[in-house]
């Protein structure tokens, strides 16, 4: 058996007496410093047998870093407001767009509260009127539209708004040169409200039209000149012109998903602070996914090519696994699941709805902008959604959106 030399014995005693986390009242960093200094009073052989002071400091440094990381993840949160200010400081967006987005987030908080209290506040059921699409307006549709419009007006940075619930675009400011154009669906999936199923708000923001200035001296605001009418019509821009887009989902938690053209970020409303807190960064949709989200109740009204596609998803052959079906009936809810898990969401044209049901300007285009920023694809079955030039505010188009491979697979069937 090998004998233990005096230097080694000294080293062992030194380690146990000085660098002992269990018995010492000093912090790990203080122990390490004391331990390292003590080495200089011993012979070289002793120092050689004692653990390296450099390794000691490295270990303490790593421990400190881990502790700091744990503390940061537990106590340091990044709110939507703080995140927007960082983007502004980095030059990604300007101060006016920051204000507009903050106003939209405020509207979403108010609508979230209304949705949660809908049954208590008697906001369920039908309003008794129909919107421009001929759909029965729910009470909460009307209230949500007022909330959204009011928040955007109060921002002082919004020139024109276009909503699902408004017949025509509305000029917000008397002079809207330099102010943003905001299109939105204040409450998507409102037919689900009575059953407490997920709903959401969708929005898109376009750049201001610097050539449009409304004359504030009009006695009758409804009488617009031909030039002013042209400015209002300029709301009809292709989705490729979008500066920002997002949606807010009102479900088991309230989630605000946003892109400003630099990736997709998700913020969750913390009920304790009343703030949207950053919870997901640079979201990427899977390239493929075995989930499809279609309303198969309309199957008989689809064309044969789409029927063939759907049949092959459900019965792909002996060597492949069939796709799973998930359908909520709320674009925001179905899209959010598709964004996270991959797959495809579709609302096709059929014998009853020649161009589908979803609106291009304030539903399909914003969602397609988001999915492309996440690495996915949005299509009408033949062309990119963001390339389509709207001809009217409430224009409808078929929508197929989700993982790139899944959307391209469908396009081959429809070609």
From Swiss-Prot:
One Pfam family per UniProt: FBPase_C
Source species: Spinacia oleracea (Spinach)
Keyword terms, alphabetized: Calvin cycle, Carbohydrate metabolism, Chloroplast, Disulfide bond, Hydrolase, Magnesium, Metal-binding, Plastid, Transit peptide
Residues annotated as binding Mg(2+) 3: 185, 188, 363
Something else known: In plants there are two FBPase isozymes: one in the cytosol and the other in the chloroplast.
Protein name stated in the entry: Fructose-1,6-bisphosphatase, chloroplastic
Taxonomic lineage: Eukaryota, Viridiplantae, Streptophyta, Embryophyta, Tracheophyta
Family, per entry: Belongs to the FBPase class 1 family.
GO CC aspect terms: chloroplast; cytoplasm; cytosol
